[in-house]
């Protein structure tokens, strides 16, 4: 796909290019590509292999199970990706050994004009390729995937959301979970009542100030309940502190009321 001179270019080195290319066909990433905000291309190292079998892996030195991805095909694929655009590219290896991908790192990715994602397979990639070509390693969590493609797709989607013009509503990214360092507040839509569960009255009041206060209170409270680590060391202003204290008091009162009901 062809982008504009100001578009972000994303290249992915993968033995499964069709898998990664799907991310540019749907949702936010698809719309951003259609608008020329991003350009995504996949590069298969098999196309740069040295033999007629397009071999990209070999047995590990020192023995052991599995296969290791070879230096030469990956190196040539990365060089081809670099040559496709004159702008400097940051090469990122998706690996469980990398730094954890969080919203701050996502924002830095979104600010990069060019990123090349390197997706490993098998037992891993020859260390010499990583030493020569990789600028950064990123992980999406402490678990093992079959390859880096899914992690690359996660990073691409998260970063594209922050590219100006990618979302239908410019405030959407600013209000996402983690964008403010807090989890998101609850959301509701029609109908007003579903199986006896209603929408909070404040959201139907038309009072935008009250709605904003309720949403901030819920975001603070939900973060306290589900991800207290995000609040550790965070400096809350007076309003935030008051709203969080109110939420905690209300939550504990509801819990006590529930316990009293269970005992009767």
UniProtKB/Swiss-Prot annotation:
Domain of life of the organism encoding this protein: Bacteria
GO cellular component: cytosol
Residues where S-adenosyl-L-methionine binds: 120, 140-145
Keywords of this entry: Cytoplasm, Methyltransferase, S-adenosyl-L-methionine, Transferase, tRNA processing
GO biological process: tRNA N1-guanine methylation
Enzyme class, first EC level, given as a word: transferase
EC number: 2.1.1.228
A UniProt-annotated Pfam family: tRNA_m1G_MT
UniProt KW S-adenosyl-L-methionine keyword: yes
Subcellular location as annotated: Cytoplasm
Recorded catalytic activity of this chain's protein: guanosine(37) in tRNA + S-adenosyl-L-methionine = N(1)-methylguanosine(37) in tRNA + S-adenosyl-L-homocysteine + H(+)
Classification via InterPro entries: Alpha/beta_knot_MTases, tRNA_m1G_MeTrfase_C_sf, tRNA_m1G_MeTrfase_TrmD, tRNA_m1G_MTases_N, tRNA_MeTrfase_TRMD/TRM10
GO molecular function, one term: tRNA (guanine(37)-N1)-methyltransferase activity
Family according to the record: Belongs to the RNA methyltransferase TrmD family.
HAMAP family found in the cross-reference section: TrmD
Its job: Specifically methylates guanosine-37 in various tRNAs.
Subunit structure: Homodimer.
Protein name listed in UniProt: tRNA (guanine-N(1)-)-methyltransferase
């Amino acid at each position: 796909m062809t982008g504009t001179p100001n578009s972000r270019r994303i290249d992915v080195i993968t033995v499964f290019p069709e898998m990664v290319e799907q991310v540019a066909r749907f949702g936010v990433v698809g719309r951003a590509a259609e608008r020329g905000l991003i350009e995504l291309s996949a590069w298969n190292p098999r196309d740069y292999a040295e033999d007629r079998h397009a071999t990209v892996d070999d047995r590990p030195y020192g023995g052991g199970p599995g296969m290791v991805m070879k230096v030469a095909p990956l190196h040539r694929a990365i060089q081809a990706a670099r040559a496709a655009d004159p702008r400097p590219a940051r090469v990122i290896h998706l690996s469980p050994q990398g730094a954890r991908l969080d919203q701050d790192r996502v924002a830095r990715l979104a600010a990069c004009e060019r990123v090349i994602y390197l997706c490993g397979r098998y037992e891993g990639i020859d260390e010499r390729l990583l030493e020569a070509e990789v600028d950064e390693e990123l992980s999406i969590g402490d678990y093992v995937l079959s390859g880096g493609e899914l992690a690359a797709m996660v990073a691409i989607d998260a970063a594209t959301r922050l590219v100006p013009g990618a979302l239908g509503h410019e405030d959407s990214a600013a209000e996402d979970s983690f964008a403010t360092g807090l989890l998101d507040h609850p959301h509701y839509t029609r109908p007003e009542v579903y199986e006896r569960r209603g929408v909070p009255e404040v959201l139907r009041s038309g009072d935008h100030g009250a709605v904003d206060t309720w949403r901030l209170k819920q975001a603070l409270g939900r973060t306290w309940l589900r991800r207290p680590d995000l609040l550790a060391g965070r400096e809350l202003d007076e309003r935030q502190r008051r709203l969080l204290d109110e939420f905690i008091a209300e939550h504990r009162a509801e819990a006590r009321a529930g316990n009293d009901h269970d005992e009767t």
